[in-house]
Amino acid sequence: MNRQKVIAIDGPGASGKGTVAARVAAALGYDYLDTGALYRLTALYAQKQGVGWHDEENVSELAKKLPAVFSDSRILLGGEDVSDGIRTEAIGMGASAVAQLPKVRASLLQRQRDFLTEKGLVADGRDTGSVVFPQAELKIFLTAESKIRAERRAKQIGIPCEGLAFERILSDIEARDEADRNRKVAPLKQQPDALLLDTSRLTIEETVKKVLDWYRKV
């Protein structure tokens, strides 16, 4: 089996996999792909076009012609900067909804694979190691306790780690976990050949170092 110059990092929402993947890519000089961003973009694009998230035929057509551009650290949709707009909890739930549609996943699959060049790639998502890059050199399932993930998300958006707003974040994370684990197509789960990395008690720096140490031993 020919291995691909890819580190695939999968895991649940708000586990820190995006931050870790981006830093690992920078350390190695590899490109970085946030596969979840494509699903979030699809959900946002469908919303803007007035298409329901469960309308498989129309959402899959929108996914095929997604007018998205990744420029440095910004993400553009039809020329509009939506870098922050796709990170809301509502769009996250939309992404989870469209990700359950087989035709949408098929529409986005080749687009994700096209990000791989000779330079190398670090990709994060929910099925990057199992479906998108099954021949990745290193596969990691990165996770953390749901309350820890909720606390990290709360700090990220500047709200206290208690009260109704925090409970809503925790509830949203747990609801998305449930949806991702139980979807019929590419459900979220650790693959047999993926290394488990629980970051509940680790800093970002410690997590990045762990991933790099593992990769250098591949």
Curated annotation (Swiss-Prot):
It catalyses: CMP + ATP = CDP + ADP; dCMP + ATP = dCDP + ADP. PANTHER family: CYTIDYLATE KINASE (PTHR21299:SF2), CYTIDYLATE KINASE/PANTOATE-BETA-ALANINE LIGASE (PTHR21299). This is Cytidylate kinase. Its EC number is 2.7.4.25. Keywords: ATP-binding, Cytoplasm, Kinase, Nucleotide-binding, Transferase. It comes from the Bacteria. The gene is cmk. GO terms for biological process: nucleobase-containing small molecule interconversion; pyrimidine nucleotide metabolic process. It comes from Neisseria meningitidis serogroup A / serotype 4A (strain DSM 15465 / Z2491). ATP binds at residues 11-19. It is found in: Cytoplasm.
